[in-house]
């Protein structure tokens, strides 16, 4: 299942997207545990900012400039994670994204939320 690094943190102006991706992550991790005794592999992959049309659609390319992975890099990272001898319940693409996801869980929300709000501008819903 495809999640996102937004699953690891609240994202002002993308609240529904972040919540949906958090659901995918949590659901997949639970299913990973439940299904493994039956020989079924369930996996959640969380790419970070990826060079696609997504940022063009929301009108914000500046947020992730310099941190974006290509779609090929993301796909290769996902396949590497799936190819491990023991597939983990989830994986994040890229070392920088994995560090960011881990730190987002450690930083108090009262500190994290204003920083995220400053780095993201609201989506223009009138387009």
Model-derived features: where do they sit?
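Residue(s) in the substrate-gating loop at a strand-loop-helix junction
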Residues: 4
